[in-house]
């Protein structure tokens, strides 16, 4: 008969193994050509090689994060009720939104909460996450997915809203220059356009088309489809950014590390509810870092030496 202590160790090992598998499944692409000049917009110049996630963080991945760090309590609102509601009449953020799908359900009681990705949404990018939730996810990965370790690591979140990336961060939210370079930069000598920056983040100057998920068109994207139109990551496999990343235009806005207007953080890429114009390199948005939105997610970056 197995002893309780052994069963506990086995359970912990199983949990850690599952987390390791999740990390191993993360696909990363390399953004090279160190020291490239910035675009005419002023963005995109990066002095070093780095990697960026090929896809945005998914509902399934974020639910695993919640299961690890927010089962006992959730003081930082890493999960919000909007994630588990289908129709939201008031987000409490100055506007009315309807027909917003669920993404993650929470069951149980404090101390034993369980987070369940909605099956039809588990491969979609997670949404309803704040900028600070994205940083805490980065800290969790930086710390090796240890239970509850979200307040330090890649970022020190004990010092208020003015957080900065640690010099020893293993993973991080990309800066605007990093994200912009990954999305739009391709040297002319390697097939890029004049000036080495594309207008849209799928290697094209041509206006993208709003196509159904699964389209093989090289300039397809998810936009003008409403909140319920958010598609699984990688739904447009041939619409790649120059570095090979997917979904950098449309589907969900992505949180950027860079601050603007003192208290805001940059958003890039456009989203399913917005039109094609938001996918352009000269378009940036911003939002309050402590708020969560039904069309905003994130992806992370790391050093090229990983």
Residue locations for each model-derived region?
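Bacterial N-terminal signal peptides
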Residues: 4-15
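Disulfide-stabilized, aromatic/cysteine-rich ligand-recognition loop
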Residues: 20, 44, 235-241, 260-306
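GGW-centered surface loops in extracellular recognition modules
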Residues: 21-40, 162-164, 168-171
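Bulky hydrophobic/aromatic "packing anchor" residues in well-ordered structure
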Residues: 31, 36, 52, 62, ...
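Short, polar loop/linker segments at the starts of domains and inter-domain junctions
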Residues: 37-53, 211-223, 244-246, 277-292
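Active-site microenvironments of metalloenzymes and redox enzymes
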Residues: 44-45, 51-211, 260-261
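Short, well-ordered junction/capping motifs at the entry into regular secondary structure
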Residues: 161-168, 213-249, 285-288
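Active-site-proximal beta-strands of protease catalytic cores
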Residues: 249-259
């Amino acid at each position: 008969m197995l002893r309780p202590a052994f069963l506990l160790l086995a359970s912990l090992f199983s949990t850690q193994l599952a987390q390791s598998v999740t990390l191993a499944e993360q696909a990363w692409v390399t953004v090279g050509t160190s020291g490239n000049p910035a675009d005419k917009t002023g963005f995109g110049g990066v002095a070093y090689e780095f990697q960026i996630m090929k896809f945005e963080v998914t509902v399934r991945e974020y639910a695993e994060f919640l299961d690890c760090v927010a089962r006992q309590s959730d003081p930082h609102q890493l999960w919000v009720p909007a994630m588990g509601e289908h129709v939201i009449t008031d987000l409490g953020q100055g506007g009315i939104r309807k027909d917003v799908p669920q993404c993650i359900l929470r069951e149980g009681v404090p101390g034993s909460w369980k987070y369940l990705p909605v099956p039809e949404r588990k491969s979609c990018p997670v949404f309803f996450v704040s900028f600070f939730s994205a940083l805490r996810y980065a800290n969790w990965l930086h710390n090796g997915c240890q239970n509850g370790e979200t307040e330090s690591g890649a970022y020190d979140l004990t010092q208020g809203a003015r957080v900065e990336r640690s010099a020893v961060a293993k993973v991080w939210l990309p800066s605007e220059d990093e994200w912009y370079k990954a999305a739009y930069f391709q040297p002319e000598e390697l097939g890029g356009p004049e000036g080495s920056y594309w207008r849209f983040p799928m290697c094209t100057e041509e206006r993208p088309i709003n196509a159904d998920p699964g389209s093989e068109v090289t300039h397809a994207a998810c936009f003008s489809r409403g909140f319920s139109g958010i598609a699984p990551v990688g739904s447009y496999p041939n619409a790649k950014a120059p570095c090979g990343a997917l979904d950098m235009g449309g589907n969900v806005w992505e949180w950027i590390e860079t601050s603007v207007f003192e208290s805001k953080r940059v958003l890039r890429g456009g989203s399913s509810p917005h039109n094609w114009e938001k996918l352009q390199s000269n378009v940036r948005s911003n939002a309050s870092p402590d708020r969560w939105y039904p069309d905003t997610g994130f992806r992370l970056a790391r050093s090229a030496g990983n």
